[in-house]
Amino acid sequence: MIRCFLPALLLVLVLGIALPVPAAPLHENETVKLPCGRTIKVLSVSRIQYSTGVMALMVRYQTTLSVEQQHKALSEEVDDVFKVAQKQVEHDGFHEAIISSNEVPHGIILTSSRMLNFIFERGADGTWTRLGRSEFMAVQ
């Protein structure tokens, strides 16, 4: 009895480890650990429609980095946020996604923060690319 059970148990364990687990959808006010090891706070996840009728999934998150300088660290962080959101974007059938980096608000009575949007577009071959500012303006 145990001899028959052990191979079956081993097979279940191997398959359980080898099969990819689908990513859970992102939720508002959720803290997410990125592949790079940083953690971010998801501010909102929403579906938006451009004036041209194109639908996209927008993920707004809070970053500790400055969005004003658009440095390499912010670019890498945005790419990591997209990697986390990509399964949800594809599952929901979108061909475009917007990742919105929002600085931590500062101020006591009047608070303010800056934000910067990054647009990702899925090509005909299924690969995702991040649009540059000039490409984004041409699409609109």
Which residues fall in each region the model found?
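Polar/charged, Gly/Pro-rich intrinsically disordered segments
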Residues: 33-65, 90-140
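Bacterial N-terminal signal peptides that target proteins for export
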Residues: 1-9
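Bacterial N-terminal signal peptides
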Residues: 8-17
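N-terminal "first-domain core" detector
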Residues: 26-30
